[in-house]
Amino acid sequence: MIVGVGVDVVDVPRFRAQLERTPALRARLFTEDERDLPLRSLAARFAAKEAIAKAMGAPPGMMWHHCWIPRPDHGDGRPTVHLTGTVQAQAEALGITHWHLSLSHDGDVATAYVVAERRAAEEESA
């Protein structure tokens, strides 16, 4: 069952300006493993984090670095969502068991689309 859907679009030059204007922002938004990625990849990951928040109803108190979008390390190249802390607690409270994520960037725009899903126990074993 779909619990929520989220989408976000980031203007890459504007995002760059925000990171340059507020150096501490990079550490607040991204995990240590994400921080050294190219700017367009960071913008897409920020869009993903915004989309994840929207899929969960934009709960207050979410810590952005509690959501990690690593580089795909499996053969199909699909991005994955890893949660800890405040974001994981909210996902668990909503019964979210699976995330479907699509990232894209082209020119000055980065975008992310996410579907939050709750699967029944019998679906898990299938």
From Swiss-Prot:
Keyword set includes Metal-binding = yes
Q: Known Pfam families for this protein?
A: ACPS (PF01648)
**What's one GO MF term for it?**
holo-[acyl-carrier-protein] synthase activity
Which EC numbers characterise this protein's activity in its record? 2.7.8.7
Q: What broad class of enzyme is this?
A: transferase
User: Where is this protein localized, as stated in its record?
Assistant: Cytoplasm
Gene Ontology cellular-component terms listed: cytoplasm
One Gene Ontology biological process: fatty acid biosynthetic process
Cofactors that this protein relies on: Mg(2+)
Q: Which family does it belong to?
A: Belongs to the P-Pant transferase superfamily. AcpS family.
What this chain does, per the record? Transfers the 4'-phosphopantetheine moiety from coenzyme A to a Ser of acyl-carrier-protein.
Kindly provide the name given to this protein in its UniProt entry: Holo-[acyl-carrier-protein] synthase
The gene designation is acpS
